[in-house]
Amino acid sequence: MNRNIRRVRREVDSYIPSNNVNVETEGYLIRRIPKKCKPKVTSTIAQRVSQLENEVAEINVALAEHVNELNSQEKRIDKLEKTVKKKKSNCSDDSECSECSECSERSCCSKCNSNKCCCNNTCGVFPNSVEAFSYYGPISGNCGPFPGGNCGPFPGGPCGPFAGGNCGPFSGGSCGPFPGGPCGPIPGGNCGPIPGGPCGPISGGPCGPISGGSCGPALPYSAAVDGYEYFQNGPMMSCPPIGPMGPNGFVEEQFVGGNGPFIGGGGFIGPNNGFVEESWGNCNDCRRGKCKKHKNRRSKSDNSDLSEYSSSNSDDSECTDSDGSSCSTDGSPDCTESENTESHRSHGKKKHRFVNKKRNTCNNSDNKDNSRINMNICDLLKLFGDKCPIKIDPNEECKQVPNEFIQIKCCQEQICCQNSCCANKNSCCTDNCCPKTKCCEKDDTNSYTIEWQKSPDCCKEIDYCEKPFSCETNYCGNSYETDYCPIYIKPDSINSNNYTNSSEKYQYNHYDSDNCSDNYSDNYSDNDSEKVYNINLDATNINTDPNYNHNFNNNHNFNNNFTNNRMTDYSTDYISHNFNPGNNQYSQQISHEQNINQQQSQNSENLLDNNEYGDYENYYNMLRGDQNIFPVNNSSNFNQYESTDISNNQNFNSQIVDSIIDTNHNKDSIQVEFSNNNDKTHHEKNECHCHEHSQPCKTTSIVPFGTPIVDCNNCRNEECITIIQTDSSCSSNKVPIIQPIEPETKTMSIIDTAIANIDTCTDLTLINQPKGISTDAAILWAAKIGNLNMNQGMKVTTDSNNNIIVAGFYRADVTPEPSNDDVPPTVIYDSKGCGVKNITASGIEEIFIVKYDMYGNFLWFAKIESTFTDFTVSIAVDTEDNVIVTGSFTDSAVNIYDSTSQLVKHIPQPIPEPSAEITQSFIVKYSPAGIYQWTAVLFTSGIAVIKSVTTDPNNNIYITGYYGGQTLTFQNSDGTDSYSLGANSLTNVFVAAYNYLGFVLWVTMCGNIGNTVSEQGYNEGLDIKYSPDQTIVVSGYYNTNPLIIYDGPDGLTPSGISLTNVNNTNINITGNDINTTPDIFLIKFRLNGTALWATKISGTITQFNTSVWASEFSGISNQFYTTIAIDPDANIIITGTYNQGPVQIFNTPSGTILSTINLIITGTISTYIIKYGPRGNAIWATRISGALSQVSNGIATDSDSNIIVSGYFSAPVTVFYSSDGTTPFTLENVSEISAFTVKYDRCGNALWAVKQENNGITQALNVAVDNNDSVVIVGTFNQAPINFYNSNKQMAKCIINDSSYDGYVAKYADFVQSLVLLPGCKQKDIAINESCYKRANTLVTYKAGTISNSVSNCLRGFLMTRANSSIKLLPNGNNWLVDYSNNILFIYP
């Protein structure tokens, strides 16, 4: 046999599909090897044999899958044939009723099935379910549902069912739904909604519905239910009569904007779980004769038995032919069975559609002029054996039109029934067709594709659809002359993270520029230098973006990082400064010509001065000293992106397309021809002017890349053919005009520089991140807590959903005598500047706990009432997002409230001691919704203060702090006593562990229970963190000499590890020498409480109750502070303050080895940052110094082991040092005290710093990092509005002050690119190129107008945060509307 032919034996009675490159002969599949992929002459025989063996194995695997699947389908078809022959129906979705007459004549319809001709269905989603609401599903029968089942709602439906129960919910039923349903029950109530009632959210609301939910709502509901006020939770009316859940229910109408379910929310769209062509249970309109089966009537759940086929090959060998193109033999044939609606009458011919996939690569050349590639869809179809569209003379007879090409445009399910050429006639259609039809866009939050639906006035002659995002007739000044707008439907399969996903019918590898060669995110591609352009033949359109279809779940939810797409869009009020779109940087109309002239002449000073609101376009230039930011090319185009070059001799495939040079357009864009999706008889070649040069502005629809195209009848446009009605009448002498879909050119531009303009004349902009280190940061939003009346104790953390939890103190009365009269309440504001919660205090000081979502929207509030002397609160979350809060109280009872504002726990007042105050501590656990779980108390007759809390992956809880004077007893959450620690005259450190139920696991201590005061000393545990190496790290200070470390579980056994105090400055207290200069300790414990190692930092460490501190900071704090963070590699980073140098840094064991790293002092008080390895050896150290004081009190790490430190400073200029001693930047202070936040990389290099400042005192008190590596800061400010600055030192946000001290919460994010969006006249898609994603953010701003989201919130810009980040924008005059977004962080004014 010729070596270019391979034989693979197939199974008996199975059918192998073939195309123009494969031939099936006598039970064998013969695969021809392209000549250009023959083994090289220089290959050895062993190499060639190995290659052939790999390919044979690949083919065998693929064929085995195909054979099994095809045989399964044949069995199913044979079964149906036998049933039809016997004139018996099995009542399946594919069966036919014998007659469409009265229901009693059709016995098959008495069972549970989804056949549209059946009137007596007992399951499914039917409008005639009189005993239950139509959108709930059936009221009887144990319906499941399971994927592929006939009954009840399918996955994503609203109902449930509950275990063992009916399909439900129904009147009196238990509370569904399971996850995926639209709303939870009212606490203690049945399943909502009911007519006139609210949706019934879980406490904390609002209800939703979430993506995939059922009811719109139709009307908002704003009354109180069971004492709760659920404003605009809706609905008050039942869902539309048809659907929307189940495979056969489809909502034809769109819920109009403003009806919720959220405040200011836009229209809510129904899920697309399939179309229904007639109402269920209504057979009166059926004609005599067979009921017609309809294409694609089943949902995706029904089609679960039609799996997609794919195979892969590990062979990486390549060969190159003479023309320079290359093909890879690693792309084995993948095929997909897509013709699930094909008539079963033809199955006896054993014809199965088969699409063979290839993978080819194209290398860049140095010819930058050849960057445009035209791809004709017909060439692609020919390659794969598909039929190309044909054009038939309208005068030809109907019989000349192949039936398989005919697809009918519909108008409210009515077509031209009198036309003898009409195929797929609807049995209930009428004789009248619509004269002219437009289709309105339907905003689908569950998919990045656009779905369209017919106008409610479909059979009226209308010019356009009056919808916010409608298919308008004048997007760009051009006119539509067409009867229909395209209808898009979600693809049957969405790409996953794997490039060789079965939903991609063809792939090309295209080598990008060298800027991507340093990509270290190897999880995204086998070859970091490759950029994959997908060509999808499902609907004969081409997908040039490898990222659009990645990382989407089965519900096609683009904002899969968010709980609800519509919950991610929030507005921000303009506070303090007036945001005027007409006169500020973000809304200037800057023409292309003006920008070019300015960029050629502006100097660095002007660039900075004009940067009023923190735009980074010019800031980059100022740092680099460049004056021409955007050099202008010969075509006067602003797109100065590094081009993706494709030479004349390097095409995608010589059999498919030829690459040509188009000199009329931007040389840096890539164009790909697409099939025309508009059904139009005329096409006006009008142009819109984009940035000084003309470019055709397509009046055709803008098709998202990779989106299958369907007609109004939900019939797949498999053959690129559409039928256009030439006349509004339905006279029998008219025949359809069958036309081919004309190719439409899609354009793409690529950006791979740090700063650039986004060209809106191209359809898609693909972004290559140039580097992975972010050196700039911008504020996303800020919110305040008004009338705190104090400036201590605020802490912050984040949970797995990037929600933000803040805890702190507020003072009810600032007068000497407690009084609530005329004292303004503490007010919690959200990021929009709206007061969302008033807190009226009942004591002197109280603890608050506030939870925000990732955009600063208020979720819930809880409080703890008592009297406090040590204003220390700590907060943590576990892996289930439960919230753990700790605090201490003195000589008073404690009242604990949860998010329902109910008193849930009372801790009695300690029995007072006549000689001293008693301070005890507590641990409180709340659920993610703020519902109280349990409390545990640390009981003593002396003092016990918890300073810090953390959790481990098993949801165990660890605390540290100090105790003194008397025995300390640790109580369980049920009130029983557990371990105790012995008494001490002064203070010792305690460490304790609890399980998730609040029961003590072990306790231990650090100190010295000696006979004299000098042996005991003052020792405090200040911070505790869980480490990824399954240990616990504790930091604090001590002046005991020595500090003895004990082991758990009872803290009675010395571990053998101790630390000496280096400082020798002692004072005499009652005859005993006490060391007044403490040392810092670091101790690592195993999770069972046994000590592993300890080390120390020595020097003159600052304690905040000194006279210097009091004069410097007006006595605002008396707390000594040091805090730690653990990075993903288990390294330990510690920060604190010191007032004399040098600081001596010791290594393990037991802090006996002095490291070579020392820090000097500049000014009064400086901040140190020291990094240790997992075993306690110092790696590097750096400092923050200035003429006066710099104090740090918060530290965190991100997913890349970068380090973020927060604090405040009084020096006029504060210098941030890197670990190598360099000083990359400074911050200036123009007030009494300003706050700072600085970021370092893992090596101690300072990357960026920002400040918060007013005319009084501003302090950053704590910092946290969320899962997006965004930075959240909390602090206080007084007397005057607070200004928030970006890292370019431009003020970007301002919040006014309500009282003596207010609190603030601010969220920052850094970025590696600053891109400016230009005005445009057509849809614009922007996406990150996954192969060039550097684990960083890209900033996009718009200056010529505004960007608004679905609820018309005004945005300053947005951040693209992930490898699959993408956004689609629609033009609205001089503004942009966000149509969908995936992994996008919006930036509010």
Swiss-Prot record:
WD repeats: 867-907, 1017-1056, 1115-1156
SUPFAM superfamilies, sorted: Quinoprotein alcohol dehydrogenase-like, YWTD domain
Principal localisation: virion
UniProt keyword ATP-binding, yes or no: no
Compositionally biased tracts (Low complexity): 304-314, 322-335
GO-annotated cellular components: virion component
Annotated segments matching region Disordered: 294-353
PANTHER family, sorted: CELL SURFACE GLYCOPROTEIN (S-LAYER PROTEIN)-LIKE PROTEIN, PHYTASE-LIKE DOMAIN-CONTAINING PROTEIN
Protein name: Uncharacterized WD repeat-containing protein L264
